[in-house]
Swiss-Prot record:
InterPro entries: T-conotoxin. It comes from the Eukaryota. Keywords: Disulfide bond, Hydroxylation, Ion channel impairing toxin, Neurotoxin, Secreted, Signal, Toxin. Pfam families: Chi-conotoxin. One of its GO terms (cellular component) is extracellular region. Residues 19-49 form a propeptide. This is Conotoxin Cal1.5. The lineage of its organism: Eukaryota, Metazoa, Spiralia, Lophotrochozoa, Mollusca.
């Protein structure tokens, strides 16, 4: 029973590391292909990563053109 909290903490660390890796891949893809004059940025949300554009009001998902 003592290892259950440790297991949960390790699971949370692994999930945040996976999100960070996905975010860096998305940022690298943005650097290679600038979207809308480099107005794009990556935002972490509760549901994962979103590609947003500074030209829109708020965080508009800019996966589509």
């Amino acid at each position: 029973m003592r290892c259950l909290p440790v297991f949960i903490i390790l699971l949370l660390l692994a999930s945040t590391a996976a999100v960070d890796v996905a975010g860096s891949k998305l940022k690298r893809r943005l650097e290679r292909k600038p979207y809308q004059g480099s107005q794009a940025y990556v935002k972490k949300t509760a549901f994962g990563l979103r590609l947003c554009c500074k030209r829109h009001h708020g965080c508009h998902p800019c996966g589509r053109t």
